Amino acid sequence: MPRAAKKPKSAKISFPFPNTTIVVGYLCLGLSLFIFLNLFFRPAKEELTYQLRSTSSSDQPLTPPNHDFSIVIPTIGATSEIVANVNPYDSRVYQQALTHGVAHAQGTGFPGEGSNIFLFAHSSANLFEASRFNSVFYLMHHLVVGDQIILWYHNQGYLYEVTDKLLVSPQSVQYLKPNSAETLTLMTCYPPGTTLKRLIVVAKPIRL
């Protein structure tokens, strides 16, 4: 009698790793850790620097990066160039501008013109880019009424004093509107590294 043909053995699939579930778990953990550090390491570093500076007896003046258009905030140790006439409604435009400094909103005033000067430093909606776009104003929440802000514009210094600080929704765009009197309005995303809220600081001009 002819023998029955043997069934071919099914090939076993082997994985290069003993347990793919563990590997995937480690990858997810690593990604989560990277995002966490990207979001919170820079703010934590800035906070530590601020606390050390607050307890230090030395009070060194801050040097503006230029005298053409820049900002100095002594209380939080912030200095930055200001990029003029940036469209605040086009994320591609303002995120590019924010890699160079604080953005001045297109259509708002300039120092000495008697209108609302609107400056902003957004966080990115992209978690991996968040710290790039908000570092200048990370510590803005420490500002209180009476703190001073200096703007340099066309080789002239302008001094402003904080009069108000507010936490608003991202849809609150009324602070971009012109005023009949000169006002300096600063805006950043809050908490740092997110786009959940907007922190607004308002200041009025005083003599320099």
Where are the regions a protein language model picked out?
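Solvent-exposed, non-transmembrane regions of membrane-associated and secreted proteins
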Residues: 16-19, 25-156, 160-208
